[in-house]
Amino acid sequence: MNIKILVATHKQYWMPEDPVYMPIHVGREGKVDIGYTGDHTGDNISSKNANYCELTGLYWAWKNLDADYIGLVHYRRYFTRKEVRSVEDKKNQILTGAEWEKLLSQYPVVVADKRKYYIESNRSHYNNAHHSDGLDVAEQIIAERYPEYSAAFTKVCNRTWAHMFNMFVMRRDLFDQYCEWMFSIL
């Protein structure tokens, strides 16, 4: 089972040594080399990093990476065996390649735990943390291109919980479908 989990980063930082983890320098176009694979080679959208953040690395993986399973984590956020707070404790709890193989033999997609927001909806959380224009435009594009998803979009926006942080590992065919859909909206 060939698993590659991108570790999105914009700076040098501690990285897991397990070969399933692949540090990727997101927004690498025009930046100094920090020693990681850059998202600026092959078919890429690295120059859009200011607006797309880690999605430039995800796009790069979609177009250039050969793997049976592809995932995304962040240089300070990983899937761990148990919840831990300190960086040092987290390093010892990050899932290994062997643990990923076992998990992915049972589930085609793994996402981050559900996070609950008791005092606000996903829409209000997004609007408070980001520019509301982006969500409004995405909603409009979904209504135009994928009207069958409009009700689900509204439902998710009105919820007070979500699987946050853009972290997942997916079987390649599902990853391809996800990227095809998402990047057609962005």
Name the predicted role of every residue range.
Residues 1-186:
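ER/Golgi luminal nucleotide-sugar-dependent glycosyltransferases, focusing on the catalytic module
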